[in-house]
A protein has these predicted regions:
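Bacterial signal peptide processing site
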Residues: 21-23
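C-terminal amphipathic alpha-helix
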Residues: 147-189
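Sec-dependent N-terminal signal peptides
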Residues: 4-13
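Extended amphipathic alpha-helical interaction segments
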Residues: 92-134, 141-144, 176-184
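Post-signal-peptide N-terminal segment of Sec-exported extracytoplasmic proteins
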Residues: 38-73
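C-terminal motif of bacterial Sec signal peptides marking the signal peptidase cleavage site
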Residues: 16-19
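Short, charged early-sequence alpha-helical segments and their helix-coil boundaries
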Residues: 72-94, 149-159, 163
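Membrane-interface starts of transmembrane alpha-helices
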Residues: 47, 51-59, 91, 125-133, ...
Length: 189
């Protein structure tokens, strides 16, 4: 009798654990819906310069982070301000990637753009580009109190663009023995 009762209890616990874990996991269809929604962020700074495979990895990281915090899909879907929540996860994931590897700055300031702007010479090899991005990331880390503050400055502050350009020019000068000329225009009312 005890064996039957013990077997029944163990079976009930095991089945409830399996039942709960299935209920808490998102389906492939639900994950795919969120991946499609993340496509709307493709033109956002940093994401627009990712290769397709890099973007798929990035969106997978965002989906995973959301799924961990909202294990029940319906809870996530019914969130008021769900779009804002997704945007917070997108920005947080970008910041995490920048913290993890400063070379990821190449996605915000791609090499062809820096050549076009006259910051870097054309034809740099991968090693020289990496040295530039490492120098630039060190200057950014010294100047901004956090990666989030840096990202906010890049996205929304036009005054920071000049500061960032100056940092880029300083790194280019340090690495390639270029002279720097900084023109500053002061407008007096």
């Amino acid at each position: 009798m005890r064996k039957i009762l013990l077997f029944t209890i163990v079976t009930a616990v095991a089945l409830s654990a399996v039942g709960c874990s299935r209920e808490r996991r998102w389906s492939d269809r639900e994950r795919e819906e969120l991946h499609r929604e993340l496509r709307a962020y493709r033109d956002m700074i940093y994401l627009e310069n990712l290769a397709e495979a890099e973007f798929n990895t990035f969106s997978g990281d965002v989906v995973e982070a959301i799924e961990i915090d909202y294990p029940v899909y319906t809870t996530f879907i019914e969130l008021p301000g769900r779009g804002d929540t997704v945007e917070v996860y997108v920005v947080s994931t970008i910041v995490e990637e920048l913290n993890a590897n400063p070379h990821n700055m190449r996605n915000i300031f791609p090499y062809p753009y820096l050549v076009e702007e006259g910051v870097l010479p054309a034809g740099l090899n991968h090693q020289a580009q990496r040295a530039f991005y490492d120098c630039f990331s060190k200057k950014v880390k010294k100047y901004y109190p956090s990666t989030q503050a840096f990202f906010n400055a890049v996205v929304g502050d036009s005054n920071s663009q000049q500061t960032l350009t100056n940092m880029q020019m300083q790194c280019a000068a340090d690495l390639f023995d270029w002279g720097i000329e900084i023109d500053e225009t002061v407008v007096v009312d």
